[in-house]
Design a protein with these regions (language model features):
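Solvent-exposed helix/loop surface patches that form functional interfaces
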Residues: 66-68, 78-89
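A sequence-composition feature that detects small, non-aromatic residues
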Residues: 9-11, 17, 41, 77, ...
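C-terminal active-site "lid" helix and adjoining low-complexity regulatory extension at the edge
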Residues: 83-105, 111, 115-120, 129-171
């Protein structure tokens, strides 16, 4: 339709680029705002594959869980076809235990962003990490909770139920 978007190129942090240099690999940090309190539902890392420049699992990428406290990847990766990867198929980097840069800064950034639009309480913030810090790529008002809850991501087989039970005060 003749509509184009021209954006400044983004250079990701070298530790993010090691995972897959062709794509800008982002953390999806899902926030839930209850009153004035912002909760972190989950964090997944989206990583590209092959020659693709997109990190989205729907475009061939993979996702894995990130531990908010340690900033490390805390699961294997999965794709949209339920395949499980212990290492990145292109770079060979082992997912579980990989230390991501500036996770706490990215979480703080997402918490602040969640307070900007109070009408939207559940948002998935796609945050890239550059050498200078976190950068917002986009906010998604329907971030999806399906792929992030696959059994390889939650070996205790409870998914996000304990989290939502707690923040929504469900007995």
């Amino acid at each position: 339709k003749g509509l184009d978007v021209l954006e400044e190129p983004l250079a990701q942090h070298p530790d993010m680029a090691k995972l897959h240099p062709q794509s800008v690999n982002t953390m999806r940090i899902v926030t839930d705002r209850v009153g004035d309190t912002v909760h972190i539902a989950y964090i997944v890392l989206k990583i590209g594959r092959g020659d693709g420049f997109c990190d989205n699992s729907g475009q061939g990428g993979v996702i894995c869980r990130v531990d908010e406290k340690t900033g490390k990847i805390c699961s294997v990766a999965t794709d949209d076809y339920f395949n499980v990867y212990e290492t990145h198929p292109d770079t060979g980097i082992r997912f579980e235990g990989y230390q991501l840069p500036m996770v706490q800064e990215a979480v703080d950034f997402a918490r602040k962003a969640a307070l900007v639009v109070p009408q939207i309480c559940h948002v998935g913030w796609d945050v890239a990490v550059t050498p200078d810090g976190p950068v917002l790529i986009e906010g998604n008002d329907y971030p999806g909770t399906d792929l992030c809850q696959l059994a390889p991501h939650y070996p205790e087989k409870q998914g996000l139920w304990p989290y939502y039970k707690e923040i929504l005060n469900i007995k």
